[in-house]
């Protein structure tokens, strides 16, 4: 999400040896390759031109939640969730949580006195969440399959506001499951909830996101099985044809998900960096310092292509409903990054290796 600075049990590695005697031929051992730590489904939904992919969170601390689908967001880092329905209403005020001392424990959640704000969105509209650093176990997924994290840092917010209008938004309307690398720039104790699992030695910390199913984007959130693989196998990293991109380190937010690329459209070759962002629901934003206007939409049937420094390439054609694309001048947006929307993930697979700080991209 564009942001201005915001079960399986592990499969054991088995060696199965065939018994033999003098008269029997020798049988080579069969090796069972390690599997991913967990494999979960996600929910796909569309409203107008806006596509969303959600991940279920069915428990925070000791509280079982209902219909808490969080935006699955490769463009931000950390889990942020509204406190409503999770802690007693008497603890929540319009100006903060009722906390005495450094922290309070309630419903299996430790809420600290450390406050922060998280901001999501771009120049055309953003939201700001007000809350505190908290710690809890989190059950990711639901009855279709789930896995529970160890006790991890999360952002528990008491208020969310539309920055442009000042309007306070409804509870749980801006819950985010940020899986990007590094840490949240404004709450730097918080990293991706997928990065905290204790994994077997032969599994690498990270995740793989399968290509989204365009047919499952409907007005009602539709469960799509097998989209998210938690924990990366050697095959994921070395034998799945992902093109790997090393990430750049920032002292503020840790490793950044931005990939050096050249973007081409209408005969222009624009060097820059790209954020591939499931949290951007509709419009790809190309940042071009040579743009003659602050912001302008590319017309339908415009061909846009990219080539990364590591050799990944992708091309699409703009439409009237999807693959919408806007060109902005960074002097207007105050953001140098080109942001590719969720539409990219309908045609491509995505992998994030937390351990080795790299992103893999793969055409399908």
Give, region by region, the residue ranges found by the protein language model.
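Pepsin/retropepsin-fold aspartyl endopeptidases
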Residues: 21-364
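Bacterial Sec-dependent N-terminal signal peptides
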Residues: 1-33
